[in-house]
Every structure is written in structure tokens, then in C-alpha cells.
């Protein structure tokens, strides 16, 4: 499989999968070389609580970024954020991949119910969320802020 404009001699990387679509038999590839990483979000996300890309990846990893963080989240029905995120330092984009997902913002509730629905909120906007159905969402945050994490109890803030 070649993309338009790609040299016929250029190597093609594929994610190797075993089993059938949706089965647990998928295998994530790893680094192809020091500048390319091929993976499977459903498996790779487990390593960093859903985060696929950001400052927290090793500096030599192509998924390391000081500018942006990307998260793949699978939420069971009725999953809810334990506490509101307050004092957020980043801008965020949340895109619904599947399901039905509600984002709570001060004075406003946003329901994402069709694939591709999204919401963006800026720095300093408090937020919370609730999965009305089993949902898969992709979150992009910027900048990637070192020392910021969700505490085990569900609150968010700088790491001690």
C-alpha cells in the first residue's frame, strides 16, 4: 500500500494484528526507528493511564512532546470524573470516537453524541465529565505541563 506522492521504494510500516477485529489478539508495534513509532492506542494507552504522547515519554521516544499531550480513553457506561478539575493550566480538545459522553463546564453541559463531536475549552476553565454510554474519546491538551497529574483519589493538580 502506497500513499500518493510516496516513492515506490519507500518501506511501508503496518501494525501487525492477530485474531479478528475487536479481539484481544492485536499487537502494538514499537519503534520502527528512532523517529517513527507505530502502535495501537487501545494497548499503548494502558502504559500511561491513557496518555499516548507528551512530556512524560522518554526524550528519545518519537511520542515525547513538550508542546502537546494526547490521550486515548475508554470509559464504561456511567463512568464519571470523581471531582471537577480546577485551575487547569492547558487548553483542551476532546473528540468523541464512539458512545455518548457529557462534558460539564461552568454554567454549561455539552453532550457529545455523534462520532466526531468535539468540545474545546481554554486555560482556566474548570471541567468534569460523565460517560452516558460506553465511550471512547481522544483528548488533546496543550502545552504538555510537567508535574501535573490526576491524583489517585481523582483530583487534579501539580505532582508533589
Name the predicted role of every residue range.
Residues 1-77, 81-84, 157-160:
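A short, N-terminal "cap"/entry segment at the start of jelly-roll beta-barrel domains
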Residues 61-64, 81-88, 105, 111, ...:
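Short histidine-centered beta-strand/loop micro-motifs
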Residues 86-102:
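Short, conserved beta-strand element in jelly-roll/cupin
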Residues 90-93, 116, 134-135:
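Short, surface-exposed beta-edge/turn micro-motifs
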Residues 107-123:
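Short acidic-glycine-tyrosine-enriched beta hairpin
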Residues 123-148:
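Ligand-binding loop in jelly-roll beta-barrel domains
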Residues 144-160:
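Short peripheral tails and domain-boundary helices/loops at the edges of structured domains
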